[in-house]
């Protein structure tokens, strides 16, 4: 347990975390540009949550020994993984509902007016797909179902790290 509690204070685990999250973003772009799967609004929101995880990893990598930096990284990690899980869950409900009027997909992402990411970087944040379509599956799970699993694993990992740190070090 002490080994696990020490991980957040080291740079290598944060780099590994950032690398894994970066690979998720690259995978999303591969699905979009090489496999021709058009991302929908919910996909873009999930992509944004993954970007939040990447930002958390970069923050943690910058100075993992500093408690304030770790707290900021933990916070961004928690918000991104929980928000991503909620968005993925809602996306699954959109795909599996039999009521065609239960959900509607917006035409463009609802980013804040001061930060219209879909206008600044349309190749990454523009949504061109339909939220109700299931265009890809692996092992019986759709893309949002896999993202739900991934976000849950990220949240569980954070919970495990924070809990072990609190139990052994009595500090974050």
Curated annotation (Swiss-Prot):
It is found in: Cell inner membrane. Keywords: Cell inner membrane, Cell membrane, Chaperone, Disulfide bond, Electron transport, Membrane, Oxidoreductase, Redox-active center, Transmembrane, Transmembrane helix, Transport. GO terms for biological process: protein folding. Residues 1-13, 65-71, 165-172 are cytoplasmic. It is a multi-pass membrane protein. It comes from the Bacteria. Disulfide bonds join 40-43, 105-131. The chain crosses the membrane at residues 14-30, 49-64, 72-89, 146-164. InterPro entries: DiS_bond_form_DsbB/BdbC, Disulphide_bond_form_DsbB, DsbB, DsbB-like_sf. Its main location: membrane. Residues 31-48, 90-145 are periplasmic. One of its GO terms (cellular component) is plasma membrane. GO terms for molecular function: electron transfer activity; protein-disulfide reductase activity. PANTHER family: DISULFIDE BOND FORMATION PROTEIN B. Required for disulfide bond formation in some periplasmic proteins. Acts by oxidizing the DsbA protein. NCBIfam families: PRK01749.1. Belongs to the DsbB family. This is Disulfide bond formation protein B. It comes from Pseudoalteromonas translucida (strain TAC 125).
